């Protein structure tokens, strides 16, 4: 009899579970379609408008590839492509070499002060790329402190662009390479020691090959960042034209939107190629991991440790000199004739380029962090946790990765063509803070999405099945289980979006208005007007806020997560 009751109970419960599952699937499908629709609306269609604009003349008539023919036959414009390529290749090589050595020191040596070196090395992440260019002007400009070190060469041009690009991309390369090198298998090094293999040979046969996919990924990430950057060449490029500045000149200076669209597509192609190669290398990197791998703990080797200590110390000094000079330049009265300190440059007397733009940046960063975190995490949850609609999930996953291949300058210009169209029902968001928030969320969507998906993969998929069998609503499961477990990741995503929204330049350079000017944009325009000290002051304000928010994030994370993540500590103790 007890068994009979149990069977009856199961039979009666099954239809209820089935209905709940069907309802959950329908809701999931609707959300998938909604997210795919949003990507079409705010990514695919704007890029389509950009392509259409490149095939039209100034009157809007279709002229095929005539604009591309003009571009290819214009030596000055075509030369910019090779200039961009040269800058990107040289900057990438230098950055990858320096970052690899630094990451090797952090992960494969016993040198002291690793935490300090890592902290200082990440400082450029908290500043706009233009800050490096401004600092170099003070160091090596026409009235620079170390101008003689350039032995007659000018900092305004490829030398300055490369130096500034290496500075601001260094921490990006360091994070990727540190992760790659930290995955080294200690068993391989133990075998090398047993075979009396030299340190150099072990490096060539174990360390290098083990990190090759990380190096490939870093190479294409840095190449794309430098190739598509606008801020650095705008400030310190001088007469050395690159694709990013050409787009700006064509659109803003000459109002030639068609040629701007053509150059944008030229800028987009290498970025897309780098994106697909990077995705391939990331997948291969995952395939190298083994469940039997042993964490590598480097042995003490005094000669190597001291050499790496000297190298990391030099890099750290250079980073501090750059940020320190930018701050000093913002405080002196009149460089280089009156070096007494003052705060007058923080008054920003130029209308529209002062404190209003700083507050606008904080608003943009706040809105991007709040709305972007919610949208991205929910989208990642749908992709990772929905059990059905594999085809739609695959489409959404592709769209979620696509923004990484689209340079900010290209995305911003495409928004002009699409949302400024009179027949677009969404025309009302053009020239508002809303369009800049949307643009920024889309621009930085991919990294946040991948971060969220990684966290969600750590959760057992049976959580959803158990909640369904207990008739617990999906939203309740999401609120009470998923969010607390993933709270560290959610906070990381929010701070990532906030800092990047504060420092972004290229993504919003075409979208701001007089009332929505941002601090990063104001810094560029102040430099254009010759007010370098005020430009440095504005850039440093961005650094202040980014540092403050980072510290606040660390404090909140430490306090809140101690309560919500107590189960992790108990699990580790057992």
Question: Which residue stretches match the model-derived regions?
Answer:
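The alpha-helix within a helix-turn-helix
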Residues: 192-193, 467
